[in-house]
């Protein structure tokens, strides 16, 4: 596991957004990238009254693994007991064997491509929240390839917003010596603060890469990750 934290200074709190944008570029990606199972940004669906007790969510990319015919997917998931209506056929009730929602879109990954993922809090009322997750795929020259909704669903909790984002690379049980060379650029996170009509945005740079299992070279290009051999 490689963890990535973002910089939120005191005048830019890390909570209460209605939009979150995160981007990953696969600079070096083997057709069967041993040790790279999931590249994602995790965050909370958080009560806006400050009481805490929010629910975990994430959005991310599972790279293609040709060695066992896995095409690759984009995921948008909610972990909690308050799932409501599902508005996209990519979505199903349940998340990692527990309660929640998992939306999965078949999406092959390509070396050199960027995957720009957006979470929108479409609606937040006293009764519920509606959220959507989309992916914009850009080719190696930055030209758009496609834009697809990963999923859209309702959460039966009122007065909620997005908070406390962090990113990570989920590895595998393979020994460190067997990892193949992988290079990923994590771009700065873009958030839009809740109830500002889309006008109050903050671009949050990478702060730290606090933990990793097998060693990683991190350089400030966004943050570019190189690991394996």
Go through the PLM ranges and name each one:
Residues 1-88, 101-104, 195-203, 210-216, ...:
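Secretory/extracellular carbohydrate-interaction modules
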Residues 14, 68, 125-127, 159:
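A generic structural signal for short, solvent-exposed coil/turn residues
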Residues 21-25, 114-120, 132-134:
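Residues within well-ordered beta-strands of beta-sheet-rich folds
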Residues 78-82, 93-97, 115-117, 179-191:
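Aromatic-enriched hydrophobic runs in primary sequence
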């Amino acid at each position: 596991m490689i963890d990535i934290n973002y910089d939120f200074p005191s005048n830019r709190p890390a909570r209460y957004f209605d939009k979150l944008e995160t981007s990953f570029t696969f600079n070096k990606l083997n057709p069967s990238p041993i040790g790279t199972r999931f590249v994602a940004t995790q965050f909370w669906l958080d009560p806006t009254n400050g009481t805490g007790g929010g629910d975990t969510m994430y959005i991310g990319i599972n790279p293609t693994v040709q060695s066992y015919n896995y095409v690759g997917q984009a995921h948008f998931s909610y972990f909690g007991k308050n799932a409501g209506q599902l508005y996209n056929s990519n979505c199903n009730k349940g998340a990692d064997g527990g309660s929640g929602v998992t939306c999965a879109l078949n999406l092959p990954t390509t070396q050199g491509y960027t995957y720009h993922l957006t979470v929108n809090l479409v609606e937040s009322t006293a009764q519920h929240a509606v959220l959507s997750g989309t992916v914009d795929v850009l080719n190696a020259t930055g030209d758009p390839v496609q834009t697809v909704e990963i999923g859209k669903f309702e959460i039966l909790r009122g007065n909620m917003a997005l908070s406390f984002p962090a990113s990570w690379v989920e590895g595998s049980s393979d020994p460190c010596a067997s990892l193949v060379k992988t290079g990923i650029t994590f771009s700065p996170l873009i958030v839009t603060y809740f109830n500002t009509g889309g006008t109050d945005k903050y671009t949050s740079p990478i702060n730290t890469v606090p933990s990793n299992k097998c060693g990683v070279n991190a350089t400030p290009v966004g943050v570019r990750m190189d690991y394996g051999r």
